[in-house]
From Swiss-Prot:
Compartment(s) where it occurs, according to its Swiss-Prot or TrEMBL record: Secreted
The organism's taxonomic lineage, starting at the top: Eukaryota, Metazoa, Chordata, Craniata, Vertebrata
Keyword annotations of the record: Antibiotic, Antimicrobial, Defensin, Disulfide bond, Secreted, Signal
GO cellular component assignments: extracellular space
Signal sequence bounds: 1-26
Official protein name in the record: Tracheal antimicrobial peptide
GO molecular function list: CCR6 chemokine receptor binding; chemoattractant activity
Record keyword DNA damage present: no
UniProt GO BP: cell chemotaxis; defense response to bacterium
Tissue distribution: Tracheal epithelium.
Pfam families on file: Defensin_beta
Function: Has antibacterial activity in vitro against Escherichia coli, Staphylococcus aureus, Klebsiella pneumonia, and Pseudomonas aeruginosa. In addition, the peptide is active against Candida albicans, indicating a broad spectrum of activity.
Amino acid sequence: MRLHHLLLALLFLVLSAWSGFTQGVGNPVSCVRNKGICVPIRCPGSMKQIGTCVGRAVKCCRKK
């Protein structure tokens, strides 16, 4: 029975860690860590959007 609890805890750990990799950039701190800048409108032509900074209105942009 203890083995089942251990395996269940390991499964939750793996699934919670995996969800972090699929989120992308979602706040200003992670934007800067990913070498991006927060832009209140759309990204300029020489940059691509890698996420959002605050809500959906402010984009996180990085050079292509």
